[in-house]
């Protein structure tokens, strides 16, 4: 299948005047050329992933590079056979990635233009991975790590990025006196988080410049020492990184077998991302727990128009029943 679609991943920390109006104007331009994607705009900068054919994406890159302060913005490009998005969104937010340091007066925000960790090239990052005295910290969410991660990297027990600072404070004895290198998908999270670690007193903090996306495309390292796939926030869900000796590390939520297929739990009030096969999705009604399987608003049940009798039958097949139900 021809790969005539390009997916652009990018970000830039740069002051944007009248960012709300900038976002509105940006959306109008994107729609005018038929671009699809999701872009966040804040006073501190811009962060986005967009997709379109060659002509459309080239128009977009030329447009962005024509904007004051964005002449050198770095686009990371994937070639794909299908669009990565169905619609176009440009939204104004407080931050281009929500670390939330100022939430509940936890801490002051970080400006990566003033404080950030040392940039590591893919080659330098690979060397860090092989150094037993270096701590490698994954700054992404738990479900991203579970699909794929760098070999030996620490998996913080967090559901979202804004929980990471507290997790680090709670576990600082593990790596306070060591060299720490961090990584994320494209680099935007690490710019801010590595700066926060520097401010916390960590003496030697590095970050993978350009993120996992750049590491996988580097002609020298070719994604080596990455296990599994990289989670992405678009229709693709998962993309390849390791082009030397790829492996599968994801495990099916229900039976632990190798799996790289993500779905959201059928209970809309849970919405946990779970790895599972189509067979197990059907078998367990896409519910990550019994409570989610029998929830009255289970989306799998409604989408497939299952009758109560059919639900009872499937529950019985896995040793469960409706009268075990509890409210979530």
UniProtKB/Swiss-Prot annotation:
Pfam families given in the database record: Rhodanese, Rhodanese_C, UPF0176_N
Domain Rhodanese span(s) in chain numbering: 130-224
Keyword Methyltransferase carried by entry: no
InterPro entries: Rhodanese-like_dom, Rhodanese-like_dom_sf, Rhodanese_C, TrhO, TRHO_N
Source organism superkingdom: Bacteria
Reactions listed under catalytic activity: uridine(34) in tRNA + AH2 + O2 = 5-hydroxyuridine(34) in tRNA + A + H2O
A single MF term (Gene Ontology): oxidoreductase activity, acting on paired donors, with incorporation or reduction of molecular oxygen
Enzyme Commission number(s) of this protein: 1.14.-.-
SMART domains per record: RHOD
GO biological process terms, semicolon-separated: tRNA modification
Family note: Belongs to the TrhO family.
Protein name per its UniProtKB record: tRNA uridine(34) hydroxylase
Gene coding for it: trhO
